[in-house]
């Protein structure tokens, strides 16, 4: 399969949507009120054999928006130090962080001949809710992600491996997971991307995708 054929397959595999893995670390559970503190995204690509794999990672520290609530319990859970000199030096505003995430996502959509990105996340509704709230709060008109459709690796992990916790699902898939590194947006996104790819590829290798195409009358035969 050529690179062009791989791009065609990616465009067809998820009905024109490009899966992009996203993780957000936040100051609580309320998307309207609580701060967005970290955001990371991993774009995916497909090799000549039709296997899905992680491509590029983009990750940013985010300055809390004005008036944002931050629960101490959330900081204790994530280990984020808001007073870290390094964090204060590199953190971006929500608007700029979203812009830096959306640019490579749009580029990947175009490169893979897709029409839109679809968010992949572990407990994806949480990340999607915070992402949509931040987009609205910052008046961003062109969100490359579908506003409500998503792929949830907690649900898929339960289906494929009988595990819904990210660390346990990764280990069931043969993916190393370091608990000490968890709850960093970059780390969690990269592990979630590996997990999603492993499940999609497992389904393909077991013949599920070919069967789905055949049942829909879309197989080459």
UniProtKB/Swiss-Prot annotation:
Signal peptide: none annotated. GO terms for molecular function: 3'-5' exonuclease activity; magnesium ion binding; nucleic acid binding; RNA exonuclease activity, producing 5'-phosphomonoesters. Keywords: Exonuclease, Hydrolase, Magnesium, Metal-binding, Nuclease, tRNA processing. It comes from the Bacteria. Residues 20-196 form the Exonuclease domain. NCBIfam families: RNaseT (TIGR01298). Homodimer. This is Ribonuclease T.
